[in-house]
Each structure stands twice: as C-alpha cells, then as structure tokens.
C-alpha cells in the first residue's frame, strides 16, 4: 500500500474508490476514467503549490525511487566498479559504467537502500572516506576515457563516525569536490 501525505488526502480518497471499482465485478469504465482524470488534476493542483515543508516530506518519502532504481531503469550493460584502491569499498556510493542508447557513460550515486537489510548494507546512504575516494576514482576514469558522467544526488550526509574521521573524512570530501570541479568531461547531476 502506498503511503499518503496529509496534503494528499483527497487523492487517497479517489484511489480508495478506484480500488473498490477495479475489484467490482461490474466495472464502470466511465466512472473509472472520470476519477482518474480527477485524480490527475488534483496531483497537478497539489504539487504545483507545495510549501517548503511539503517538498521536504516528498523528498523523504520512503517509497520514492533510489539511485539503484534509476540506474537499473536508465542504463544497459551495467558494470559496477568497487573500492577506492586504498582501504575498502563503501556501499553507500555506487558507481560504474553503463550505456544509454548504446553510448557509454559513467555513473555515480548515493544509495540509501529500500529495506532494512539494504539500508544497513548501504549505511543509510552516509558515505565514509572510501566512498568519497571511490567518487574521485570514477571522476578520474570518466575524464581519462573522455566519457560523460551522470551523478545521482540523494544523500543524508557524510557518515559522522569516529572511524570515518580518523580515516580522513573531511579531506576526502574536500578532494572529491576539487576533483569534480576540475573534471574535464561532461558531468550531469540529478538531485
């Protein structure tokens, strides 16, 4: 079941009626079509007038797509690259090579996970120094092979643990920013 926000209560009512109509033996196609049109108009009206807090709520919705969902639906011939070549692989950052319309591109993104198991695996999307170094590595590879890079930004922020600080969290973040700003290949960020 989809979760609705308080400001979506009218949409939820229409969805409930549509579910009942779809489960009914005697389908009323005209009524379903009318309700779907009404629902679409409500979505347009509501989402064109969200206040700042409602925008935050939407951005944090538990059922919205995550980076891996986008990667799996946008790219073909996906090859994930792992590790920072210094310490470890940070699963909060996913990246690699893929194709869009038969053209190779690099991709990078923060992954939060969809279930408790995957959220733990991806550290709730909080990158450690090795994740930021993985980003640097992928940026440099994209530049070396003169391929565009697409990044997906959906971050909760850097991991605030003592071990991450001891391994150079601040420096890794700063260097990632420097490498990204100096990268001489087309880069697109999707937030």
Give, region by region, the residue ranges found by the protein language model.
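Terminal-region recognition feature
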Residues: 1-191
């Amino acid at each position: 079941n989809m979760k609705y926000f308080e400001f979506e209560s009218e949409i939820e009512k229409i969805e409930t009626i549509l579910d009942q109509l779809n489960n009914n033996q005697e389908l009323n196609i005209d009524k379903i079509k009318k309700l779907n049109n009404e629902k679409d108009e409500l979505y347009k009206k509501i989402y064109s007038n969200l206040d700042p807090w409602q925008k935050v709520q939407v951005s944090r919705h538990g059922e919205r797509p995550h980076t891996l969902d986008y990667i799996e639906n946008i790219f073909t011939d996906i090859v994930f690259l792992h590790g920072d070549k210094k310490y470890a692989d940070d699963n909060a950052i996913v990246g690699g090579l893929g194709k869009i319309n038969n053209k190779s591109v690099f991709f990078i993104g923060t992954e939060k996970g969809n279930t408790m198991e995957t959220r733990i695996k991806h550290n709730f999307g909080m990158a450690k120094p090795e994740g930021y170094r993985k980003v640097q590595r992928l940026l440099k590879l994209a530049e070396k092979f003169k391929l565009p890079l697409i990044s997906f930004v959906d971050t909760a922020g850097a991991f605030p643990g003592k071990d991450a600080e001891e391994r150079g969290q601040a420096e890794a973040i700063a260097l990632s920013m420097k490498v990204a700003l100096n990268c001489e290949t087309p880069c697109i960020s999707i937030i």
